[in-house]
Amino acid sequence: MIPGEYQLQDGEIELCAGRERITVEVANTGDRPIQIGSHYHFAEANPALIFDRDKTRGYRLDVAAGTAIRFEPGQRREVTLIPFVGRRHVYGFRQAVMGALDEKGATS
């Protein structure tokens, strides 16, 4: 092996295999593009994006880590989301959760 060399497996690699997935339609009603990153808590996305926020609580984009999806002004599209896993604690973003996603009485 050469330092820094990649040894890749042949074929396709499925990201997040076996995870529950949901699809939501999203519309950008703003006048500027909006980009959402791979691990952003989707329910807390820019208010100019119109979609069912309650349905997306605890979910993030089903895209490769470090990538994003861009919504152009006036654009409407479907996106696939997957749930956060692990401890399911969310902090920051727009500060709508600030703790455990599954906590009783928690709102976003």
Curated annotation (Swiss-Prot):
Its main location: cytoplasm. CDD domains: Urease_beta. GO terms for molecular function: urease activity. It is found in: Cytoplasm. Its EC number is 3.5.1.5. It catalyses: urea + 2 H2O + H(+) = hydrogencarbonate + 2 NH4(+). It comes from the Bacteria. It holds the Pfam family Urease_beta. GO terms for biological process: urea catabolic process. Belongs to the urease beta subunit family. Heterotrimer of UreA (gamma), UreB (beta) and UreC (alpha) subunits. Three heterotrimers associate to form the active enzyme. HAMAP family: Urease_beta (MF_01954). NCBIfam families: PRK13203.1 (NF009682), urease_beta (TIGR00192). This is Urease subunit beta. It comes from Chromohalobacter salexigens (strain ATCC BAA-138 / DSM 3043 / CIP 106854 / NCIMB 13768 / 1H11).
